[in-house]
């Protein structure tokens, strides 16, 4: 299976404050930002027991620049309706107009946040498909995280550096009837 797509987002507008007493308009922000992205996602079964998933996205932001965002994974289809998956993906979040240009914490020099995500999961269907359960282990390594921090006694949005996050997720669901299911 091959999926190809394109995204376009336009952000912008004009802001101002109006003094109630005098009616005076005080100019605020008049900014525009555009984001273009093209992507390709590919999934291929390699026999009955293995699937390959791969994708790439190129994201261009009018103020931040261009970034390549890859992802890839393998799915192992095991006996007894069990499945194991391994995945690696990159994530990206561009700064918003508010974070860059509006209100006292604004900072026009912000860079995009970047994440690398690693996942390993196991799942199984049982009881003729009525029962489904799974567990997912993940690790996230992030850089350039945007936070509001005091700078010279005033709040300012800055790229603060690195983060690490890891954890375990689990899920279980049971289909009681064709109309009822509990999770």
Specify the residue positions occupied by each region the protein language model found:
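Membrane-embedded beta-barrel scaffold of Gram-negative outer-membrane proteins
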Residues: 77, 83-85, 112-166, 171-182
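Extracellular loop and loop/strand-boundary signature of outer-membrane beta-barrel proteins
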Residues: 21-29, 55-60, 102-108, 153-159, ...
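Transmembrane beta-barrel architecture of outer-membrane proteins
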Residues: 8-14, 30-38, 58-70, 88-92, ...
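Face-selective signature of the C-terminal outer-membrane beta-barrel domain
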Residues: 1-64, 77-79, 131-137, 183
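Outer-membrane beta-barrel translocator domains and adjoining extracellular loop/strand segments
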Residues: 14-23, 64-70, 97-103, 145-153
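Feature captures outer-membrane beta-barrel proteins of Gram-negative bacteria and organelles
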Residues: 1, 27, 35-45, 67-77, ...
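Residue-level detector of conserved, well-ordered beta-strand and adjacent loop positions
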Residues: 5, 98, 111
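A structural preference for long, well-packed, hydrophobic secondary-structure segments
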Residues: 18, 33, 50-52, 66-69, ...
